[in-house]
Structures are given as structure tokens and as C-alpha cells.
Amino acid sequence: MNYLLFILHCLFSGLSFSQKIFSTKEAYSADVIVFVVKNEYQADLKVFKSKNQFQPNQNKGIWYFVDNQYTADKKVYFTENQYQATLKLFFVEYEYQAGWKDKSKMHLLY
């Protein structure tokens, strides 16, 4: 029984870590094309850049940037043109500020 609980814990504990994001240089290899807006009110998602990949998260905008695309949960491409983006981001200073403003786009990062 303890073994089963341990296995379940290992499987589901990964769901609570910050999202590992890889920034691609080509739009065609990205899962999501994003644009960074200048004002918070323009954003679909407010993102906090975590320094810790094990920071609790449930698709709430806490991102940890990785150097390898194979360890990433999602690959994003930062575009310079807002009209090309499927998701508009605003980077926040504090973790508690992170979160979705347009929840209809949450599926993009699952």
C-alpha cells in the first residue's frame, strides 16, 4: 500500500511544479506564440519568472525558463508583432501578481 501511495505521489507531484518554458528562435517550432505587452490591462496572462523550477504552480503564470527544449513543458516564441501572437503576456515583479486575465486561453498552456 505504501508503495502505491509513493508511486501516485511521484506521478502527481510534478503537476504542482512551475511550468518549464523554453524560448524558441523559430515560430514554427513553438507550441504558443506570445507577445509581451507594455500594460497589464492588455495581457491575457500575467507571468512571474521563477528562479526555482519546483515552485508550486497550477497553470497560474509561474514560469521557469529552461535551456533545453526537451525538458520544457511548453515551447514559446516571442514575436515582435502583437497580431501574430496567440497569447499576450505581461511580466510581473511578484509571484502573487501572476495569473490569468483571460481564462478562455488557459488551454494553450496545458
Whereabouts are the PLM-identified features?
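Bacterial Sec-dependent N-terminal signal peptides
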Residues: M1-I21
